[in-house]
């Protein structure tokens, strides 16, 4: 128990140290913001090598896929797709949303009223 009491007495000093360290860290990060980054040759790390290799492997695949799907992104095809999607899914979105909200509201009110006598009001039969 005395160990816990000693630690509680040291808590304000510990908080002060943490606050001072946080301020020092913030001041140092502000000081480093204006310094230029190291040249790219000095920046090379294992992760940058992995990233470079992945980019090297995936770039041809991405380019081939982009070339194959180029027909889809032409204005007439894309416009047709969007018009069909709108007609199928979004044209009556406003009325459907309003109906869903009203139904959800009624359902929630019914559940609330059914719970009220048991929780808040007690049973009406025991009056």
Curated annotation (Swiss-Prot):
GO terms for cellular component: high-density lipoprotein particle; very-low-density lipoprotein particle. Keywords: Lipid transport, Secreted, Signal, Transport. Residues 1-27 form the signal peptide. It is found in: Secreted. InterPro entries: APOC4. Pfam families: APOC4 (PF15119). GO terms for biological process: lipid storage; lipid transport; positive regulation of triglyceride storage; triglyceride homeostasis. Belongs to the apolipoprotein C4 family. May participate in lipoprotein metabolism. This is Apolipoprotein C-IV. The gene is APOC4.
């Amino acid at each position: 128990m005395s160990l816990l009491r000693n630690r509680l007495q040291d808590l304000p000093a510990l908080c002060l140290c943490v606050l001072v360290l946080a301020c020092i860290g913030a001041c140092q990060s502000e000081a480093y913001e204006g310094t230029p980054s190291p040249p790219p040759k000095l920046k090379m790390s294992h992760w940058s090598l992995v990233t470079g290799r992945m980019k090297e492997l995936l770039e041809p695949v991405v380019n081939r896929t982009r070339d194959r799907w180029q027909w889809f992104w032409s204005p007439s095809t894309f416009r047709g797709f969007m018009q069909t999607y709108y007609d199928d899914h979004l044209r009556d979105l406003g009325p459907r949303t309003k109906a869903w909200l009203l139904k959800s509201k009624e359902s929630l009110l019914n559940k609330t009223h059914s719970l009220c006598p048991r929780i808040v009001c007690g049973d009406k039969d025991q009056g």
